[in-house]
């Protein structure tokens, strides 16, 4: 993977970088039609038109690619035919042609190449792109697209460059221990499936967007500080000039404490499966 740098021909180009897609992607053609569905823009609104997620809206129109997170096509080999861009995620995707004629998209893992064969099986070989139950994967292996519930589909480590490491297995064989990229160590049922390898496009976090307009293309709207708003818009607002917030601690637009408050529900059933909390940034 390579980062492409631009000359400072304009203010927006200064320090701007992009991913060199030509080094990885194999096609500029349209995606597989049978695996594409239309996607309507929600702009962070619910069915009543109220904002439920701030700073979203606009952006380029996209079509959704149906990704096989479940990898439930068992014991049937497939061949990677293309590596493609997906506007809905920061990872790339691969089109897999199975021997029975079916086609599916899976996440692109570091080291995948066109022509490679992949399979999801109980006793699949431990090589990049194959999917197997956690109980049959050796300790120390880097994984992605890990299930939290058997058969539900991968939920952990799906974004660009992410992976989890299998640290160990319980004596009774029911759970395995994983270390997440956040530093959290947790247990997962050994029957859950995971895919071998790290998600590709690992240099995505190094991209310098260069100008606000590129974020608008992605559907990200500006984030305005509360201290520059009016008092009817935010608890930090109001005052003459650059006034302090006038409170002991920063708060959200709805008056709740904003910093240092743990937001995870301690009564969650999965709380007992967390061996070590995630490390602070």
Curated annotation (Swiss-Prot):
Keyword Ribonucleoprotein: yes
Keywords on record: Ribonucleoprotein, Ribosomal protein, RNA-binding, rRNA-binding
GO biological process terms held by the UniProt record: cytoplasmic translation
GO terms of molecular function: rRNA binding; structural constituent of ribosome; transferase activity
Region (Disordered): 223-255
NCBIfam families referenced in this protein's UniProt entry, alphabetically: rplB_bact
Subunit note: Part of the 50S ribosomal subunit. Forms a bridge to the 30S subunit in the 70S ribosome.
Family indicated by similarity: Belongs to the universal ribosomal protein uL2 family.
Name the record gives this protein: Large ribosomal subunit protein uL2
Organism lineage: Bacteria, Bacillati, Mycoplasmatota, Mollicutes, Mycoplasmataceae
């Amino acid at each position: 993977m390579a980062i492409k740098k631009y000359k400072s021909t304009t203010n927006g180009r200064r320090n701007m970088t992009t991913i060199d897609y030509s080094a990885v992607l194999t096609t500029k053609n349209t995606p597989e039609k049978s695996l594409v569905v239309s996607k309507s823009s929600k702009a962070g609104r619910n069915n009543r038109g109220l904002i439920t997620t701030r700073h979203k809206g606009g952006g380029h129109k996209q079509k959704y690619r149906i990704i096989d997170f479940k990898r439930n096509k068992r014991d049937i080999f497939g061949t990677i035919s293309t590596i493609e861009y997906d506007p809905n995620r920061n990872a790339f995707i691969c089109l897999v042609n199975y021997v029975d004629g079916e086609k599916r998209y899976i996440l692109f893992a570091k080291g995948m190449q066109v022509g490679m064969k992949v399979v999801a099986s109980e006793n699949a070989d431990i090589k990049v792109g194959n999917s197997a139950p956690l109980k049959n994967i050796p300790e120390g292996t880097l994984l992605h697209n890990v299930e939290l519930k058997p058969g539900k589909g991968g939920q952990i480590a799906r974004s660009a460059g992410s992976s989890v490491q299998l640290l160990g297995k319980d004596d009774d064989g029911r759970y395995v221990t994983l270390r997440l990229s956040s530093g959290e160590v947790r247990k997962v049922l050994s029957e859950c499936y995971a895919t071998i390898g790290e998600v590709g496009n690992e240099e995505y976090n190094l991209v310098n967007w260069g100008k606000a307009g590129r974020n608008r293309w992605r559907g990200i709207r500006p984030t305005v500080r509360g201290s520059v708003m009016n008092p009817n818009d935010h608890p930090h607002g109001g005052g003459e000039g650059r006034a302090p917030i006038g409170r002991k601690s920063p708060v959200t637009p709805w008056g709740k404490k904003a910093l240092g408050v743990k937001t995870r529900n301690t009564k969650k059933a999965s709380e007992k499966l967390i061996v070590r909390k995630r490390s602070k940034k």
